[in-house]
UniProtKB/Swiss-Prot annotation:
<keyword id="KW-1003">Cell membrane</keyword>
<dbReference type="GO" id="GO:0030097">
    <property type="term" value="P:hemopoiesis"/>
</dbReference>
<keyword id="KW-0472">Membrane</keyword>
<dbReference type="GO" id="GO:0120162">
    <property type="term" value="P:positive regulation of cold-induced thermogenesis"/>
</dbReference>
<dbReference type="GO" id="GO:1900182">
    <property type="term" value="P:positive regulation of protein localization to nucleus"/>
</dbReference>
<dbReference type="GO" id="GO:0000423">
    <property type="term" value="P:mitophagy"/>
</dbReference>
<dbReference type="GO" id="GO:1900038">
    <property type="term" value="P:negative regulation of cellular response to hypoxia"/>
</dbReference>
<feature type="modified residue" description="Phosphoserine; by GSK3-beta; alternate">
    <location>
        <position position="4"/>
    </location>
</feature>
<dbReference type="GO" id="GO:0098696">
    <property type="term" value="P:regulation of neurotransmitter receptor localization to postsynaptic specialization membrane"/>
</dbReference>
<feature type="repeat" description="TPR 7">
    <location>
        <begin position="249"/>
        <end position="282"/>
    </location>
</feature>
<feature type="modified residue" description="N-acetylalanine">
    <location>
        <position position="2"/>
    </location>
</feature>
<dbReference type="GO" id="GO:0006111">
    <property type="term" value="P:regulation of gluconeogenesis"/>
</dbReference>
<feature type="repeat" description="TPR 13; truncated">
    <location>
        <begin position="453"/>
        <end position="463"/>
    </location>
</feature>
<dbReference type="GO" id="GO:0017122">
    <property type="term" value="C:protein N-acetylglucosaminyltransferase complex"/>
</dbReference>
<feature type="repeat" description="TPR 12">
    <location>
        <begin position="419"/>
        <end position="452"/>
    </location>
</feature>
<dbReference type="GO" id="GO:0098978">
    <property type="term" value="C:glutamatergic synapse"/>
</dbReference>
<keyword id="KW-0156">Chromatin regulator</keyword>
Length: 1036
């Protein structure tokens, strides 16, 4: 604030002396000499103005006003006196009076520069920014070379956000006075605000070069270097500032922040403590000290520091947010939410708090509200990469894959070194089947952040999917060690429960992984504060019927529906009332239509996204037994089961493992799949089906495969049943229309050990190689879709989608006679064809080695695999060549529509099951095609399903107890053709006569198990193992 001291004329030099003393700050001496002069010249207004200014500087406002008033009395037109009086009013907070006096001074003296400067300051204090700008502009109109005033105008424009105008002011000030360090520093601030970091650094460095003692410029330089993450130079700038002002607490705090970013946590902690020592009421320093303590693992002390910061400043938003983070990590979700909301109440534009709150809301299943807060975070901070990445996670959970992809991509554009975003993007690629892209993104994430368990374990799974076994053993060891450490520290393991079966983990680890995911569901439902449901103790309200609820996201075109779609309609309506709860929208397929039509009640819970309300609906339906068909597969909503809307809850069919969850009572399984001696692997009680827990609806979906005919393909005197095969509903009528059809009897053993096979021969229709057979073969060779023979439509087995797409998907039964040949798939006519139609991730190095050993022992044999995925093919071929197999010994085919997939299984001689994780649905598919399957049960549920299927089928001779026995069984089938024919005949016969595909008998056995569960519960008992199943027959 400029005081006007006037001009004092005194021949004695007394006035000149008083002026020098005033300028030097020696106000006491200046006042003494002014008073002496005033007594000599009472009418000297210059002396009065100087006295007014002296008293103002000494904060003696009343005396200052007194002398200004005396000067005005002496000269009412004295502008300087009015300006000095305005200064007094401004200092007292009487802004309007101050402004009026400044304006009066300017009316008296329009070129009064100090008057404009003082008026500008008062207008700023009064909030009239535009008026202040005009005051500075007026001053500069009278003297354009006032570089300090122009710099002050620049500061005001900068504060108003008018950065370009501010920049012009600073540049003009520098042009006027190139060595004006303040303008260089202020210009650096503008460039920093505009994101021009390097220009900002340049201008701050120029400022300190011009003025090596310019404290603020060193602080600004340190700040911008810190933001640019040029930490060594930032440290140097802050240390220089501290050499100028050793007790500057804020600089100590900023320097500590740089040490923290450099990972020098102990040094950061010491420096924060020094800042607090210098300024005990420094909430920012307490908050940042807490951050460093938390990083070091001193969580309790960190929590104390956050609380201290909040005691000093209850509205300290950063401390509220960071304390909320601690509460969240401690599992105190409600307190975390309260603190996040408080932080936003204090500071609504707090982007990080919006993002953190959104993350917790997402964890609670409140996805729409989470999405809203992520959008707010991004609105406030458009370059908030974390918010984009986390919003992508929410959109992914909401099944908006494209939206998630865009979010992750934007996060990476903002911050190319953002490892989490690369990992999240990889997961989108992985879920979309773009495995090479996923692998590349996971590897980028790990380069950026080598200690990144989620990225490592997901990369391991991707490499498993494409059979990339580089450093396989080391990878498995590291993966196991990661899981061990995470379980020890009570963290959510990076291996998903559904993938745990693929790795050499202990049973305890697999169960613990599932348990952690089950606990996540409990965390989500705890926030709902729903009181426990009251459950029925009897069947009175349901007219004596047991109400069973099947919950699945797979009621549609999905392998689970292919297996069980007939069961809801086969329940005894007198004893059971069936509810099907869909977790996914209608996909428009006949699979969905069938379940909807045949269940007593079909409820689409995908339209009730709130888990609490969905569970209420299930409870209102009075369900007695609620069946979980998803486990931890895609689309699951285990939170519904965590709320326990039914008294009995059971796992069944859709998930090959334990839930690890206390809210699941039973797992429906069988003695072969889950032997009683390994019951500790399961959190649930074992509930045994009498034969196998697995079932397939193949007899209903593919009845045209119950019979087949072959075209006479002779080699070495044998008639082969799988070179050129015809199937169809009207097959018998078609064969009756043909001349010379032969019936060849194929001997096969029965389901037991009966050596007399004469009574179990199967009749195989054989069409001789005549003009009709040649027409069929020509259709195949020429790639025709369909021909007509004797009024029957004969179709190319590769063209089912072109003839009837619903038949191709298995939704309808094909109405034509379908021809399937080895030549269609490039399979050798005269070779033994081993097959496996599983996804390639189920093959591990030891499995491929067994396959290679078998092929080497069986001359003229091949292994038929699927491009599932296609990118796995070159890896398998390369490893096979390394094992000594020529490339032509392994043949790949594309994945086919469901009906073709099942039907073409007839062309193989033997299926080699994958011991790591069996073919479950694919096992049923290949057995329905009549092809024997060799398996070797392991220790996990997923590795024992095929043995269960074969046991039910009565084909124990195909179950190996060791790798050597597995190879020997496969080799015998490939070298002893008579034995192969017998086993193929047995499988062909047993698939019809055994319980394996008998859905009606299976449903009755399942009902018996449900009644056991209910009777046990109704008697007041807790769930217990049910390992002595009651067998029923179809006539029962």
């Amino acid at each position: 604030m400029a005081s006007s001291v006037g001009n004092v004329a005194d021949s004695t030099g007394l006035a000149e002396l008083a002026h020098r003393e005033y300028q030097a700050g020696d106000f006491e001496a200046a006042e003494r000499h002014c008073m002496q002069l005033w007594r000599q010249e009472p009418d000297n207004t210059g002396v009065l103005l100087l006295l007014s200014s002296i008293h103002f500087q000494c904060r003696r406002l009343d005396r200052s006003a007194h002398f200004s008033t005396l000067a005005i009395k002496q000269n009412p037109l004295l502008a300087e006196a009015y300006s000095n009086l305005g200064n007094v009013y401004k200092e007292r907070g009487q802004l309007q009076e101050a402004i009026e006096h400044y304006r009066h001074a300017l009316r008296l003296k329009p070129d009064f520069i100090d008057g404009y400067i003082n008026l500008a300051a008062a207008l700023v204090a009064a909030g009239d920014m535009e008026g202040a700008v005009q005051a500075y502009v007026s001053a500069l109109q009278y003297n354009p070379d006032l570089y300090c005033v122009r710099s002050d105008l620049g500061n005001l424009l900068k504060a108003l956000g008018r950065l370009e105008e501010a920049k012009a002011c600073y540049l003009k000030a520098i042009e006027t006075q190139p060595n004006f360090a303040v303008a260089w520093s202020n210009l650096g601030c503008v460039f920093n605000a505009q994101g021009e970091i390097w220009l900002a650094i340049h201008h701050f460095e120029k400022a300190v070069t011009l003025d090596p003692n310019f404290l603020d410029a060193y602080i600004n330089l340190g700040n911008v270097l810190k933001e640019a993450r040029i930490f060594d130079r930032a440290v140097a700038a802050y240390l220089r500032a501290l050499s100028l002002s050793p007790n500057h607490a804020v600089v100590h705090g900023n320097l500590a922040c740089v040490y923290y970013e450099q990972g020098l946590i102990d040094l950061a902690i010491d420096t924060y403590r020094r800042a607090i020592e210098l300024q005990p009421h420094f909430p920012d320093a307490y908050c940042n000290l807490a951050n460093a303590l938390k990083e070091k693992g001193s969580v309790a002390e960190a929590e104390d520091c956050y609380n201290t910061a909040l005691r000093l400043c209850p509205t300290h938003a950063d401390s509220l947010n960071n304390l909320a983070n601690i509460k969240r990590e401690q599992g105190n979700i409600e307190e975390a939410v309260r603190l996040y909301r408080k932080a936003l109440e204090v500071f609504p534009e707090f982007a990080a708090a919006h993002s953190n709150l959104a993350s917790v809301l997402q964890q609670q299943g409140k996805l729409q509200e989470a999405l809203m807060h992520y959008k707010e975070a991004i609105r406030i901070s458009p370059t908030f990469a974390d918010a984009y990445s986390n919003m992508g996670n929410t959109l992914k959970e909401m099944q908006d894959v494209q939206g998630a992809l865009q979010c992750y991509t934007r996060a990476i554009q903002i911050n190319p070194a953002f490892a989490d975003a690369h990992s999240n993007l990889a997961s989108i690629h992985k879920d979309s089947g773009n495995i090479p892209e996923a692998i590349a993104s996971y590897r980028t994430a790990l380069k950026l952040k080598p200690d990144f368990p989620d990225a490592y374990c997901n990369l391991a799974h991707c490499l498993q999917i494409v059979c990339d076994w580089t450093d396989y053993d080391e990878r498995m060891k590291k993966l196991v060690s990661i899981v061990a450490e995470q379980l020890e520290k009570n963290r959510l393991p990076s291996v998903h429960p559904h993938h745990s079966m693929l790795y050499p983990l202990s049973h305890g680890f697999r169960k613990a992984i599932a348990e952690r995911h089950g606990n996540l569901c409990l965390d989500k439902i705890n926030v709902l504060h729903k009181p426990p449901y009251e459950h029925p103790k009897d069947l009175k309200l349901s007219d004596g019927r047991l109400r069973v609820g099947y919950v699945s996201s797979d009621f549609g075109n999905h392998p689970t529906s292919h297996l069980m779609q007939s069961i809801p309609g086969m329940h005894n309506p007198d004893k059971f009332e069936v509810f099907c709860y869909a977790l996914s929208p209608d996909d428009g397929t006949n699979f969905r239509v069938k379940v909807m039509a045949e269940a007593n009640h079909f409820i689409d819970l995908s339209q009730i996204p709130c888990n609490g309300k969905a569970a209420d609906r299930i409870h209102q339906d009075g369900i007695h037994i609620l069946v979980n068909m998803n486990g931890y597969t895609k689309g699951a909503r285990n939170e519904l089961f965590a709320l326990r809307p039914a008294p009995i809850q059971a796992m069944w069919l859709g998930y090959p493992g334990t839930s690890g969850a206390l809210f699941m009572d039973y797992i429906i399984t069988d003695q072969e799949t889950s032997p009683a001696e390994v019951a500790e692997q399961y959190s649930e009680k074992l509930a045994y089906m009498p034969h196998t827990f697995f079932i397939g609806d193949h007899a209903n979906m593919f009845p045209h495969l119950k019979k087949k005919a072959v075209i006479d393909f002779k080699s070495n005197g044998h008639i082969y049943d799988n070179r050129i095969v015809l199937n169809g509903i009207d097959l018998k009528a078609f064969l009756d229309s043909l001349p010379d059809v032969k019936i060849v009897k194929m001997k096969c053993p029965d389901g037991g050990d009966n050596a007399d096979t004469t009574n179990t021969a199967l009749n195989m229709p054989v069409i001789p190689m005549n003009t009709i057979a040649e027409a069929v073969i020509e259709m195949i060779n020429r790639g025709q879709i369909q021909i007509t023979i004797n009024g029957f439509s004969i179709s190319n087995g590769l063209a089912t989608t072109q003839i009837n797409n619903k038949a191709a998907t298995g939704e309808e039964v094909p109405r034509t006679i379908i021809v399937t040949t080895r030549s269609q798939y490039g399979l050798p006519e005269d070779a033994i064809v081993y097959c496996n139609f599983n996804q390639l991730y189920k093959i591990d190095p030891s499995t491929l080695q067994m396959g290679a050993n078998i092929l080497k022992r069986v001359p003229n044999s091949v292994l038929w695999l699927l491009r599932f995925p296609a990118v796995g093919e070159p890896n398998i071929q390369q490893y096979a060549q390394n094992m000594g197999l020529p490339q032509n010994r392994i043949i790949f085919s594309p994945v086919a529509p469901k009906e073709e997939h099942v039907r073409r299984g007839q062309l193989a001689d033997v299926c080699l099951d994958t011991p790591l994780c069996n073919g479950h649905t694919t096992g049923m598919d290949v057995l329905w095609a009549g092809t024997p399957m060799v398996t070797m049960p392991g220790e996990t549920l997923a590795s024992r399903v095929a043995a269960s299927q074969l046991t039910c089928l009565g084909c124990l001779e195909l179950i190996a107890k060791s790798r050597q026995e597995y190879e020997d069984i496969a080799v015998k089938l490939g070298t002893d053709l008579e034995y192969l024919k017998k086993i193929r005949g047995k499988v062909w016969k047993q698939r019809i006569s055994s319980p394996l595909f008998n859905t009606k008998q299976y449903t009755m056995e399942l009902e018996r198990l449900y009644l056991q569960m209910w009777e046990h519960y109704a008697a007041g008992n807790k769930p217990d193992h049910m390992i002595k199943p009651v067998e029923v027959t179809e006539s029962a």
